[in-house]
Structure formats: C-alpha cells, structure tokens
C-alpha cells in the first residue's frame, strides 16, 4: 500500500477516534466511558485504539487538547484587541476557563493527566506544549499592555498560569461558575499589580 494512502487511513481512524471519544466524554463523562465503547463507536478494534492512545487518560488528552488549542486561539485574538493588562489577561483566560468547565469532571481529570500523566506519550507532550504556549501568550500580552519588562512579564505570566491551574483544580471551585473563577483570578492578578480589579 502506498505511504500516502496508509497515512490517510491513519488520520481517518484518528479522526474517528477523536469524534467518538469527544462525543462519549461530553455526554457521559470520562469516568463513565470505557475504551471498548470508544472503539465500538469509532468502528475499530481496541487493539487499534491503543495504537493511538495507550489509556483512557491519553484519549481524554487527545480530545481536550484540541479544545484547549481552540480556546487559546480565541483568547489570543480577543487579547489583541485589548489595551489594558487586566482586560487582556481576562480575554486570554476566559475561553480556557469555559473550555475546562464545559464538563467539570472531564476538566479536572484533564488537569490531573497534564500534571501527572506519562510525559513520554505524544498527547501528554502536546498538552504541555499548550501550557507553554499559553504562558508565552500571557507574557507577550502583559509586556504589550503594561509597563513591565520582559522578565517581569514572564514572571507574572507564570503566576497567572499557576492561579488558573489552581482555580480550576481547587475542590472549593467545583460549584463556582466560570464568571466567578475569571473574576477571582482577575482580583488576584490586580493585587499582584497593586491596582484595583475593576480599574
């Protein structure tokens, strides 16, 4: 079989797996879905499924990475329109918070996989690349919209990233709304900058 066709078939199977896992996770939550159900929905064998992701956690990373990439793209475009540092940071983190909170159980499991998953797996590697990209976007945006130099902007970006992770992972935030979480992060960032959150 020609390489081109083989690669097309691989990509087509990957897209079927992605679509099946995405739908099942969205409807039932990652904890209530089996790999067999995903394989059946994608019309492939479980052996084939494990060639693309070695665990259910990896499958969740595969699905959620795409959503987080889209959220980061949306946040980047929105932040480019802002001139105030707090508004620009809000513009970046809001789509990420909404993405994570679309299904709270899946969002929390995703964060756990990002933090503690197998770093040698491609989907985990991609999730870490998204974290780095989000921090770089934050740093660039902070430097553009504030009086901070590049080093301090990078430090604040890491702090915002940590605040975001903690806010999404904290047990007390399970019942919080996306709007409340974004507002809480805004207040914390404003405190770091020494200015009112609603300035």
Can you annotate each of these PLM segments?
Residues 1-28, 32-41, 58-61:
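Basic, helix-initiating cap at the start of DNA-binding domains
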Residues 100-121, 169-172:
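Amphipathic alpha-helical segments used for helix-helix packing
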